[in-house]
Amino acid sequence: MAILTRMLGSPLFVEIRRGAVDRLAELLTERHISSDGTVLVALGRGQGEAIWATLEESLPRAGVFVVQSASLDCASELLKRLDERDYDAVVGIGGGRTLDVAKYAATRAALPMIAVATNLAHDGICSPVSSLTHPGGSGSFGVAMPLAVMVDLDYVHRAPPRMVRSGIGDAISNLSAIEDWYLAHRHRGEAVDGLAVTFARTAAEAMLHRQDDIASDDFLIALAEALILSGMAMSVAGTSRPCSGACHEIIHSINALHPTVSNHGELAGLGALFAFFLREDQPRFDLVLRCLLRHGLPVHPADVGLDEEQFLEAVLHAPATRPDRYTILEHLDLGREDMRARVTQFGQLTRPDGLRLVQEATR
């Protein structure tokens, strides 16, 4: 008999609005997650701690753990804390790093996890992946998606604008990842999940053409929804493929070679722009370029603190970060001098005088 349906993992509850976090204790009770608030709250430093100060009275039975770093060691410490009491769930309050630690520990403890996001820097708020550092470098670990996602716009507005804008770069990089997935399908026979593509593309397109910005509640709602949809795309696919291609190989390479130069979302947008340049997809290159410029995101290696030679080395090293993945980088398989020529041309196009010529040509 043919299989006519399939089960899709998704959050049980999503709330994106001002004042959303005030309903956390109520959510735990209403959704039968924890009738008396016996949860372990993993807090990010800064905003996470500030939010907890407003919630502590409503959750007197909760335990508290401050996340010091997005590391496997820190996640293991949180896991040990979970063994000390019979907790009903893990609540992560903070940015992507805090949520990654909370997701990992909750998954290993077989407990539900509630994500309370204080910024929108990348799609980690709802993804089935935790990115954690370890003594050998960094790794991506498969985890359960959050049972519930809360995004309080009051706190997102207080987050550093640069961090919030970077989520735009992560969302639009889906477009490049999708192209890489189809490329792998054509040349390697890799299966493509159409529903995952639909979620990932919808997330990216929602950001690509908007003319408002992060000062607007409507824009932040759209960005939060885009990042949640990206997480859904990965859950549906059972892999990060719909949201991770050459763009993310470049991110991992830059992080390995120059770990302090920029953040995930900014590098995702830059990596996607370079990938569209390599594909010689001028219409899509122009759209992505305009979106990044509109939101003040990096479009040139120098914008993230890299010179041409450093960016070249990162691009050449990028395929080694995901040996199992086939993207435009593996497809072209350019040698050093050929790639140097492409990097130089890309730099000329995206430096200020080059941008003026591009913008004049596309009016």
Residue positions per predicted region:
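ATP/NTP phosphate-donor binding region
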Residues: M1-A89
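C-terminal charged capping/lid subdomain of soluble metabolic enzymes
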Residues: M1-I3, M7-L8, G169-A171, D281-R363
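Solvent-exposed alpha-helices and their adjacent loops that cap or buttress functional pockets
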Residues: R6-M7, I33-S34, L82-R85, A106, ...
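A glycine/threonine-rich phosphate-anchoring loop and its flanking beta-alpha core
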Residues: L12, E26, R108-A203
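Short glycine/serine/threonine-rich phosphate/pyrophosphate-binding segments
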Residues: L24, G48-I51, R97-K103, H122-I125, ...
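Non-transmembrane, aqueous-exposed alpha-helical and coiled segments at domain scale
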Residues: C74-D86, A246-C247, Q282, L349, ...
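A short, small-residue-rich loop immediately preceding and capping a beta-strand
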Residues: L82-A105, A109-L120
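Active-site segments that bind and position negatively charged phosphate/pyrophosphate groups
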Residues: G194-A302, L306
